[in-house]
């Protein structure tokens, strides 16, 4: 019998090989993975009916069996009618098929994708295997420079380190207001799922603990499917398709994990008019920071990837920073190197803060000086951040001007932190 690892590797290879074939026909990887998602959901629904006698969630006449028996233009027509109908449904199905459209209009290639999916039994496959296959496809999609999908994909080793530091606990609510393909939520779920054997707590974790928002329908589809394959949100997706910044948070949460989009708001976005915001600005990441500060419960914790300018920008940036330091404990800043994100040249940090107490001191971990990562030759791995996570948990300085000037971990009283110096020395990590 094949091991999980063998199954994962062979299936991933099969999926990638077909992606290469379709790319030769002008079908991009993003379009491919989207169609794969739509079809895989139909197949798993059919397996649920066949193996467990469950009632199909798909309306009669639009199920997997109605698709696999067809060829040629009849297949394309049936598929497109199915997508249209399912995009109008409620709950999980409506989310998975949000604004769904067929991007494989040549029947022979659509049939190839359907046949590949039909060869496997997906529902009984180990959830970790299904999830790992899908995650690997999402990562490959993130590498596709033409699609720009990298902006929705945060390196998983960084996510895992952030989650290990924040340490979400089962029973807590976790939100990512710019969730992309769901990496933070999924990693938080994996961290919490073994913490309790209580059915009540595990049901809460699967169905109510996680909350994600993204304003791109395609990304909402991918995130919802990613979580579904891991057993999360099987009735209703925890992902909502909307603009987080347009309205005040309806509920407060215990934990926020996020990497909000950098730069300005996309063309056509609604202007931000939030009376609850501390200051009005067109800076996207500053608005996300305000939104997240307002979303946290008292005592709530956040780990957020933000660009360098958030640390030193004047005007609105200074106003928000003062609020952050007064009403929150901004206790840790992880300075990141370039070369770890699919969007090249990004200078970023992870800000860790807790709501309810003012900041007295800030710990800085310099993972920028003399650190070089590239996606090709020295890709970031989780072990690269082991020292940071250990320092985060132990709070013992490793920097010593005389004995260990290369130490990366040191603290400053908040009044000693010079944001002007940070701006003047962007390549330096320490103040």
Predicted regions and their residues:
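Non-catalytic, mostly N-terminal accessory regions of nucleic-acid modification and defense proteins
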Residues: 1-170, 235-244, 335-338, 359-368, ...
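A conserved structural/catalytic subdomain of Rossmann-like adenosyl-cofactor enzymes
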Residues: 2-6, 247-429
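Generic detector of ordered secondary-structure context
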Residues: 14, 27-31, 125, 154, ...
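Residues within alpha-helical segments
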Residues: 20, 36, 178, 189, ...
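Surface-exposed acidic, glycine-flexible loop patches that form ligand/cofactor-binding
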Residues: 122, 201-203, 295
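Conserved S-adenosyl-L-methionine
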Residues: 148-258, 263-265, 274-276, 280-282, ...
């Amino acid at each position: 019998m094949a091991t999980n690892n063998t199954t994962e590797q062979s299936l991933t290879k099969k999926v990638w090989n077909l992606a290469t074939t379709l790319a030769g026909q002008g079908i991009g990887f993003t379009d491919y993975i989207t169609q794969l998602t739509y079809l895989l959901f139909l197949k798993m629904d059919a397996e649920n009916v066949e193996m467990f006698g469950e009632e199909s969630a798909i309306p009669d006449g639009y199920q997997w069996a109605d698709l696999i028996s067809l060829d040629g233009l009849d297949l394309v027509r049936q598929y497109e009618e199915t997508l249209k109908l399912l995009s109008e449904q409620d709950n999980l199905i409506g989310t998975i098929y949000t604004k769904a459209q067929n991007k494989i209009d040549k029947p022979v290639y659509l049939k190839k994708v359907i046949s590949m999916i039909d060869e496997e039994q997906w529902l009984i496959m180990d959830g970790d295997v299904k999830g790992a296959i899908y995650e690997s496809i999402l990562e490959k999609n993130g590498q596709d420079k033409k699609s720009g999908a990298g902006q929705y994909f945060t390196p998983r080793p960084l996510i895992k380190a952030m989650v290990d530091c924040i340490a979400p606990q089962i029973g807590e609510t976790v939100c990512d207001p710019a969730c992309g393909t769901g990496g933070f939520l999924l990693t938080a779920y994996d961290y919490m799922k073994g913490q309790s054997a209580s059915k009540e707590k595990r049901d809460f974790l699967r169905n109510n603990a996680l909350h994600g928002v993204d304003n791109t329908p395609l990304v909402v589809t991918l995130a919802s499917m990613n979580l579904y394959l891991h057993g999360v949100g099987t009735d209703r997706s925890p992902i909502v398709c909307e603009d987080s910044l347009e309205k005040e948070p309806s509920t407060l949460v215990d934990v926020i994990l996020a990497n909000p989009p950098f730069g300005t708001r996309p063309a056509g976005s609604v202007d931000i008019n939030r009376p609850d915001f501390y200051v009005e600005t067109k800076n996207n990441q500053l608005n996300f920071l305000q939104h997240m500060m307002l979303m946290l419960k008292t005592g709530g914790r956040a780990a957020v990837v933000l660009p360098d300018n958030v640390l030193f920008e004047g005007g609105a940036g200074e106003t928000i920073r003062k609020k952050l330091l007064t009403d929150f404990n901004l206790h840790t800043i992880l300075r990141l190197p370039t070369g770890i994100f699919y969007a090249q040249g990004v200078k970023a940090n992870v800000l860790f803060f807790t709501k309810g107490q003012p900041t007295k001191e800030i710990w800085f971990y310099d993972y920028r000086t003399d650190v070089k990562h590239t996606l090709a030759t020295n890709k970031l791995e989780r072990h690269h951040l082991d020292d940071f996570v250990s320092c985060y948990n132990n709070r013992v300085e490793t920097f010593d001007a005389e004995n260990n000037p290369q130490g990366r971990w040191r603290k400053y009283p908040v009044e000693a932190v010079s944001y002007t110096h940070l701006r003047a020395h962007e390549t330096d990590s320490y103040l």
